[in-house]
């Protein structure tokens, strides 16, 4: 059995420019700042890159949960972290790659247990161009342009609980996490090694804490570009959390555009939960900020009254209630 947390989030971006692409070489002037966007057919969908979301998440974990972050080293045109997931929380959760000298152990990599999609607009729309001037000087004002949008962004993430705090010496890309110096440190700090598989495991309380911190940070995620003139709360306004046996993300197709609005398709959500009920390891937790998609409340209340196959239920509340109730299940999920 593999144990994976799957999460779905919506971020309200009513007047925002959260991730910019810079100037476009084809623009008529060189002082237009474009937002990141993709095209599907004739429609344009603004987005926030997956890397930007990870940066916000990591920054929140450092500031609110006092995570010890791996220092960045730079050599010529490459940059890398310390590649020490025992000492640094983020090297464990966010992964790393570092090319050491052969005598030091060679190249080590770690696939991140935390995976996420970009935040992509549910609604197809063309960003608005806003004109401004720099006029706090003598002489002619300097004009400039930038884009912003009004939409709802959707995102997915998963957290591989089996991989958190577990490191391998295997010669396999993505799984050779350890090098001689790190193995010495692991032995000194009492990590348990399985000689047959070459697997080192951190104490379970450390693994559980890291998993809980990652999830508990959700209601507090902050960040984004253009906040001085397009102030936006980027913490999720809608969230779904569950743990499943498997790695596929079952919540990918539960939102859509309808009459120019972003909606949650509760029938699609119900169908996918029933179809994959044999994979559910926990109840399903839905959190929503009041004032956001209030029209969903009757449908969500109806879902919470229905028992899924296997006696799994859908539970709903505020964002923080849903996150706290779900993280209370992490310790049980991560029992040895």
Model region roles, listed by residue range:
Residues 1-336:
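RNA-binding basic/glycine-rich loop and surface signature characteristic of RAMP-family CRISPR effectors
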């Amino acid at each position: 059995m593999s144990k994976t947390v799957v999460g779905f989030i919506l971020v309200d971006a009513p007047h925002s420019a959260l991730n910019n692409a810079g100037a476009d070489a084809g623009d008529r002037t060189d002082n237009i700042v474009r937002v990141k966007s993709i095209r599907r057919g004739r429609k344009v969908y603004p987005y926030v890159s997956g890397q930007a979301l990870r940066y916000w998440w990591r920054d929140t974990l450092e500031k609110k949960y006092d995570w010890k972050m791996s220092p960045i080293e730079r050599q010529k045109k490459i940059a890398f972290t310390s590649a020490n997931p025992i000492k640094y929380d983020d090297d464990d959760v966010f992964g790393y790659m570092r090319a050491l000298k052969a005598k030091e152990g060679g190249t080590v990599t770690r696939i991140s247990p935390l995976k996420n999609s970009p935040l992509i607009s549910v609604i197809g729309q063309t960003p608005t161009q806003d004109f401004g001037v720099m006029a706090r000087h003598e002489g002619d004002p300097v004009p400039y342009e930038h884009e912003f949008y009004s939409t709802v962004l959707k995102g997915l993430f998963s957290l591989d609980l089996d991989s958190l705090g577990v490191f391998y010496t295997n010669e396999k890309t993505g799984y050779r996490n350890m090098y001689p110096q790190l193995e010495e440190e692991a032995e000194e700090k009492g990590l348990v090694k399985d000689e047959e598989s070459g697997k080192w495991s951190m104490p379970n309380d450390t693994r559980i804490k890291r998993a809980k911190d990652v999830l508990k940070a959700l209601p507090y995620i902050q960040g984004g570009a253009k906040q001085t003139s397009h102030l936006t709360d980027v913490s999720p306004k809608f969230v779904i959390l569950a743990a499943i046996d498997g790695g596929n993300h079952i919540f990918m197709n539960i939102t859509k555009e309808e009459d120019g609005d972003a909606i949650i398709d509760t029938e699609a959500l119900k169908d996918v939960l029933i179809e994959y009920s044999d994979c559910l390891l926990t109840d399903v937790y839905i959190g929503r900020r009041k004032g956001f998609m209030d029209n969903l409340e009757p449908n969500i209340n109806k879902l919470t009254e229905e028992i899924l196959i296997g006696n799994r239920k859908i539970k709903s509340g505020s964002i923080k209630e849903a996150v706290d109730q779900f993280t209370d299940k992490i310790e049980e999920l991560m029992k040895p």
